[in-house]
């Protein structure tokens, strides 16, 4: 007679084993109709799974984030159902949930076209509209293997052979004549899977290994209702307009080419923004009392072996050899910073020691994962490492948190999601050390009035971590900042300091990044601002245009004056109509467009308009310079009169 405890604390007693769907029906027919799955004693279960003992139960519906993830997963199975109807010879590989959607990797000789994708989507909708039940069967490993062997599903067999114990009892989900295998849970009926769209096709190697066969990957998105789907598709359209690769080309910021995959060729205007970002962070480093250092680009393999990176990270490292020695180009800055710390005897009075670097790092990312500035092989990390005592951890982490929020708010990012990853099952150190470390991070977050989500067991083996994820104007999430405690690397690389009692102690190391990769953050900014950078970041802040040749000398004097004032300015003296020139520089997203005619020249004035077409009227040159200087020094996100 299980007693079911609901989230509001109420209890319901049943005379026999019940499913989540049974409990929902006992509460009311509306909830039964909306029920997708259940969280039983903290674990997600299918709506049909029986609950035989007392349990705590949350009923999952499409209003829950988990419910939407489940229906997305079921849409992947629906896609498989449709594919097998249209191309029965298809071999199905994997179909997981991803952010905002799902994909399925398939082995099919026929190369899918956009017309095929549209036909597949239509077939999926036809199937879903029949509102068929999804039937779950838990079977033996052998029965599952026999089922897929009879269907010629070699990839499912490989998953069973290589990833699932023979003692396991896999779950098979039957969509009418189509059968798939999954941990689940899945929707009980396809009425939940009515609002989806297939988005694109790509290539993907089986198991992500380039030595394996290339499969076709079909991406889709799915939502709980028509409105949510429509909102998402509208956001995607806006994201396409803001694509940093497209805007980067339009504004001549950078380019990438086949001969240097994942490496950025910065053009003048793009490099101007990059340097401005660097200057901004450098000011923050001075404000928060950091040393700035510079380590070598590559170091001997021996050092990477001692740090532990060679065992865990060597496949992602670029290497080279010289004079019978093997070197690795650094994928991160931390081992180099420990080497700098180790030079000379350090006392407890020297701690905390905050060491920062704009480190040029390289990682051998798979070519298929490269994506403009967002995923590169060569990047600059605004990395820092703080060497401190246990007692200093909380205060130092608190300062890091303040620096993160101080920095992000300057760029207009106010919606920050914070997660704290705690001790994993396999870890160094005793529970007392982890208790102190985790509590220090929690207290630092609370002291700054930061709400955070705990991720139990998600920390690194060498210490807990705080992650900062910012949300942009399209509500996309970008994980940028991190604060990571490290109790292992200083010890591995022999870092010590002389404590107050003259004993040798190992410092705690705090890994800290604010922007992360400057390249990636610049890509985020391009899309956030749609190329319309605030004045302080804009590569060209002012362009001055003449109406006739008579004003040419005066225009050049104005630009010289601006440059002497530290304002990035240029002139346009082309023999073109002023309307044409205004339009061209508006498309270049230059914040301020200054026009000079005879009257302006005579009165030592400029006619000012913004890139948004707002006419600010005539101003004395010195007055305009004062206003724009104030805007730049405040790092205002708005233009004058906005």
Curated annotation (Swiss-Prot):
Subcellular localization(s) per the UniProt record: Cytoplasm
Region span, Catalytic: 243-534
Cofactor binding annotation: Binds 1 zinc ion per subunit.
Database matches in InterPro entries: aa-tRNA-synt_IIb, aa-tRNA-synth_II, aa-tRNA-synth_II/BPL/LPL, Anticodon-bd, Anticodon-bd_dom_sf, Beta-grasp_dom_sf, TGS, TGS-like
GO cellular component: cytosol
UniProt cofactor(s): Zn(2+)
Catalytic reactions of this protein: tRNA(Thr) + L-threonine + ATP = L-threonyl-tRNA(Thr) + AMP + diphosphate + H(+)
Keyword Nucleotide-binding on entry: yes
Organism superkingdom: Bacteria
Sequence intervals crossing the membrane: none
Domain named TGS: residues: 1-61
Annotated residues for binding of Zn(2+): 334, 385, 511
Function: Catalyzes the attachment of threonine to tRNA(Thr) in a two-step reaction: L-threonine is first activated by ATP to form Thr-AMP and then transferred to the acceptor end of tRNA(Thr). Also edits incorrectly charged L-seryl-tRNA(Thr).
HAMAP family recorded: Thr_tRNA_synth
Assembly behavior: Homodimer.
Name the record gives this protein: Threonine--tRNA ligase
UniProt organism field: Shewanella putrefaciens (strain CN-32 / ATCC BAA-453)
Encoding gene, per UniProt annotation: thrS
């Amino acid at each position: 007679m299980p007693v079911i405890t609901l989230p509001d604390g109420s209890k319901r007693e049943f005379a026999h084993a019940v499913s989540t769907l049974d409990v929902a029906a006992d509460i009311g027919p509306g909830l039964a109709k909306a029920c997708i799955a259940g969280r039983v004693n903290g674990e997600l279960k299918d709506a049909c799974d029986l609950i035989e003992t007392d349990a705590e139960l949350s009923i999952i519906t499409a209003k829950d984030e988990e419910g939407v993830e489940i229906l997305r997963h079921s849409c992947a199975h629906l896609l498989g159902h449709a594919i097998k109807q249209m191309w029965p010879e298809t071999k199905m590989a994997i179909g997981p949930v991803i952010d905002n959607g799902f994909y399925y990797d398939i082995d099919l000789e026929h190369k899918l076209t956009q017309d095929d994708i549209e036909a597949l989507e239509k077939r999926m909708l036809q199937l879903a509209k029949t509102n068929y039940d999804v039937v779950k069967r838990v079977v033996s490993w052998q029965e599952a293997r026999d089922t897929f062997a009879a269907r010629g599903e070699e990839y499912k067999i490989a998953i069973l052979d290589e990833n699932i114990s023979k003692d396991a009892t896999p779950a098979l989900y039957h969509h009418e004549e189509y059968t798939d295998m999954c941990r689940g849970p899945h929707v009980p009926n396809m009425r939940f899977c009515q609002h989806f769209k297939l988005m694109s096709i790509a290539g993907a190697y089986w198991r992500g290994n380039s030595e394996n066969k290339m499969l076709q990957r079909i991406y889709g998105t799915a939502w709980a209702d028509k409105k949510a789907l429509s909102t998402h598709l509208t956001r995607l359209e806006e994201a396409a307009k803001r694509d940093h690769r497209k805007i980067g080309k339009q504004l001549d910021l950078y380019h990438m080419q086949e001969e240097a995959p994942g490496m950025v060729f910065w053009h003048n205007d793009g490099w101007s923004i990059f340097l401005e970002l660097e200057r901004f962070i450098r000011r923050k480093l001075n404000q928060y009392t950091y040393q700035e250092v510079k380590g070598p680009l590559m170091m001997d393999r021996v050092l990477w072996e001692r740090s532990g990176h060679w065992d865990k990270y060597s496949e992602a490292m670029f290497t080279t050899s010289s004079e019978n020695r093997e070197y690795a180009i650094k994928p991160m800055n931390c081992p180099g910073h420990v080497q700098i710390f180790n030079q000379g005897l350090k006392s407890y009075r020297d701690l905390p020691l905050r060491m920062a670097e704009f480190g040029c790092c390289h990682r051998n990312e798979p070519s298929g994962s490269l994506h403009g500035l967002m995923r590169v092989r060569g990047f600059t990390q605004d990395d820092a490492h703080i060497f401190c005592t246990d007692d200093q951890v909380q205060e130092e982490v608190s300062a890091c948190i303040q620096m993160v929020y101080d920095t992000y708010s300057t760029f207009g990012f106010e919606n920050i999601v914070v997660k704290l990853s705690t001790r994993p099952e396999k870890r160094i150190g005793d529970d007392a050390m982890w208790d102190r470390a985790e509590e220090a991070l929690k207290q630092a977050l609370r002291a700054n009035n930061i709400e955070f989500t705990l991720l139990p067991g998600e920390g690194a083996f060498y210490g807990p971590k705080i992650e900062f994820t910012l949300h942009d104007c399209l509500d996309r999430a970008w994980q940028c900042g991190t604060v990571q405690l490290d109790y292992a690397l200083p010890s591995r690389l022999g870092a010590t300091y002389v404590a107050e009692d003259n004993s040798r102690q190992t410092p705690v190391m705090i890994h800290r990044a604010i922007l992360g990769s400057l390249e990636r953050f610049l890509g985020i900014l391009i899309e956030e601002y749609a190329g319309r950078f605030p004045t302080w970041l804009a590569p060209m802040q002012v362009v001055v245009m003449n109406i006739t040749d008579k004003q040419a000398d005066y225009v050049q004097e104005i630009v010289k004056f601006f440059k002497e004032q530290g304002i990035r300015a240029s002139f346009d003296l082309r023999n073109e109509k002023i309307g044409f020139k205004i339009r061209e520089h508006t498309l270049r997203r230059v914040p301020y467009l200054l026009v000079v005619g005879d009257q302006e020249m005579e009165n030592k004035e400029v006619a000012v308009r913004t890139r948004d077409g707002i006419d600010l009227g005539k101003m004395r040159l010195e007055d305009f310079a004062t206003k724009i200087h104030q805007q730049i020094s405040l790092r205002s996100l708005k233009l004058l009169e906005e």
